């Protein structure tokens, strides 16, 4: 094994395959061990057969490039299939259209860009604005920064849902997009999508529903009898929806879907250019070259699981999450934020308990349990999935023991995504 000091420059001589793989294997030793069920988020495990079908699809499409589907027509069909299946799950119709992207952030970027371009083309809006809740994903702020939109951010209600009345006061003639979440990430609660969509429609703005977390949970939760308030294309005024297949769709990273209620809406996220020496250039999203690997993996996983497979995984996920919520509420000194009914759980200290939640996170991490950290208030966030099956009971034992002994920490940093 070479020292890291030797890695500042690429070696003159190549290295044997087994040596390279051995070093990569060693590098992983400090990563979270997600396969033991002790990581809440980041990786979503659909089980051995899902691994197998994804790995075989990955080998078949390791080098294929969706930049030009004339060369790889199978990728055009794969994208069409996956988009169509997802649109059907989200109650689209024959007019619903979309594209695959690399993940939820890119899907959100595409939705915001389409809203901005439509606002300019159809409403002559040159100073576009977006209205959202403070619980909406940070990617909307990234999109606003990239594409030059002004963001109006409304506070959440006491139950952490979007405050639609506050949002209504921010909507004006320059509004091109109003955002709702199904569910929102921080506390896992679902916004009032019909009211948000009506608000957008009142000024002829787009309404984007961020279902990156819920797109492959809510359709199946509804099928097993959960009470799901309206959120998808059945809601009048919903223009675009983002849904991540690489989360609770159990496909490998990174693949997501951006759906539009019409093909006319979809055209606003695309870019076409033919005034250069290289010929016709068109791209449906933020990428140029697009790996066929995640697209093929998504197709394979969805075909392998089918509706029944997703129902089973969703049922187990919700059992895990319900068990975690009930267990947390039974531990003195900690509580669950919001009335989330799905798979996202945010755990905070009871007021006046004196518990330092980030110190609690440190104590749980010492026992192998990994959470994201959020504030305000300081809380530990869990994205529960099938991955955590069989681990929740031990988690609750460890949680109770750690709560009883936890101290304090000076580390107040929160985590969702990092630069390096």
Predicted regions and their residues:
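N-terminal entrance/gating region of PLP-dependent enzymes' catalytic architecture
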Residues: 1-95
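Active-site C-terminal subdomain of aminotransferase-like
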Residues: 223-342, 347-352, 419-420
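Conserved PLP-binding catalytic core of the aspartate aminotransferase-like
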Residues: 333-397
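Active-site pre-lysine segment of PLP-dependent enzymes
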Residues: 164-166, 190-202, 214-240
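Active-site phosphate-binding strand-loop segment of PLP-dependent enzymes
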Residues: 162-211
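Conserved beta-loop-alpha segment that forms the PLP phosphate-binding cup at the N-terminus of a helix
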Residues: 79, 83-84, 95-123, 140-143
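PLP-dependent aminotransferase-like
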Residues: 120-174
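PLP-dependent enzyme catalytic core of the Aspartate aminotransferase-like
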Residues: 383-420
């Amino acid at each position: 094994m070479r020292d890291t000091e030797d890695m500042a420059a690429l070696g003159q001589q190549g290295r044997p395959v087994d040596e390279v793989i051995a070093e990569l294997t060693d590098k992983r030793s400090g990563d979270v061990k997600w396969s033991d069920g002790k990581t809440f988020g980041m990786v979503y495990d659909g089980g051995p057969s899902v691994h197998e079908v994804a790995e075989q699809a990955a080998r078949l499409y390791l080098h294929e490039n969706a930049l030009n589907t004339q060369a790889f027509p199978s990728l055009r069909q794969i994208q069409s299939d996956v988009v169509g299946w997802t649109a059907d799950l989200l109650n689209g119709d024959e007019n619903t259209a979309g594209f695959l992207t690399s993940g939820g952030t890119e899907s959100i970027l595409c939705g915001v860009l389409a809203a901005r371009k439509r606002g300019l083309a159809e409403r002559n809006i040159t100073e576009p604005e977006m209205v959202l809740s403070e619980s909406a994903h940070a990617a909307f702020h990234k999109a606003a920064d990239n594409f030059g939109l002004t963001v109006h951010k409304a506070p959440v209600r006491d139950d952490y849902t979007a405050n639609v009345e506050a949002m209504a006061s921010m909507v004006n003639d320059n509004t091109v997009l109003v955002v709702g979440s199904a569910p929102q990430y921080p506390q896992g609660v679902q916004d009032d999508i019909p009211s948000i969509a009506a608000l957008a429609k009142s000024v002829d703005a787009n309404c984007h529903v961020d279902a990156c977390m819920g797109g492959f949970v809510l359709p199946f939760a509804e099928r097993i009898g959960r009470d799901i308030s309206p959120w998808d294309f059945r809601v009048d005024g919903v223009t675009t929806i983002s849904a991540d297949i690489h989360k609770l769709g159990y496909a490998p990273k990174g693949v997501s879907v951006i759906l539009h209620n019409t093909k006319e809406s979809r055209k606003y996220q695309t870019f076409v250019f033919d005034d250069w020496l290289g010929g016709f250039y068109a791209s449906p999203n933020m990428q140029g070259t697009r790996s066929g690997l995640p697209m093929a993996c998504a197709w394979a996983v969805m075909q392998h699981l089918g509706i029944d497979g997703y129902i089973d995984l969703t049922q187990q996920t919700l059992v895990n999450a319900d068990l975690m919520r009930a267990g947390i509420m039974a531990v003195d000194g900690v509580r669950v934020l919001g009335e989330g009914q799905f798979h996202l759980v945010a755990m905070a200290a009871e007021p006046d308990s004196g518990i330092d939640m980030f110190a609690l996170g440190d104590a749980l991490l010492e026992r192998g349990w990994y959470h994201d950290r959020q504030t305000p208030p300081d809380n530990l966030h869990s994205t529960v999935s099938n991955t955590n099956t069989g681990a929740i009971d031990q988690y609750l034992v460890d949680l109770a023991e750690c709560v009883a002994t936890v101290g304090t920490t000076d580390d107040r940093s929160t985590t969702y995504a990092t630069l390096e």
